[in-house]
């Protein structure tokens, strides 16, 4: 599947529709830190998101320490952000809301 890179002027509006996501310093990715009650909640979040990401064919860069999960989303094939990143970010937000 081929994805179109988002125009730089479209990114601020797209971020307004997401909860707590930020544009990376390089401007080629969005990032968010998720925080949970404990490691089991954090790992459960990652497990559920991994299944969604696999079905989408789009995989996050992420890092987990205890109850925190740091996520970075970008589309490597186009060297920047696409609608696919926004879709996965929204799905991850929904998973996190169910785990609070």
From Swiss-Prot:
Name recorded for this polypeptide: Putative pterin-4-alpha-carbinolamine dehydratase
EC numbers on record: 4.2.1.96
GO MF entry, a single one: 4-alpha-hydroxytetrahydrobiopterin dehydratase activity
Catalytic activity entry: (4aS,6R)-4a-hydroxy-L-erythro-5,6,7,8-tetrahydrobiopterin = (6R)-L-erythro-6,7-dihydrobiopterin + H2O
EC class of the enzyme, as a word: lyase
Key words of the record: Lyase
Similarity annotation: Belongs to the pterin-4-alpha-carbinolamine dehydratase family.
Family annotation (CDD domains): PCD_DCoH_subfamily_b (cd00914)
Taxonomy, superkingdom: Bacteria
Gene Ontology terms: biological process: tetrahydrobiopterin biosynthetic process
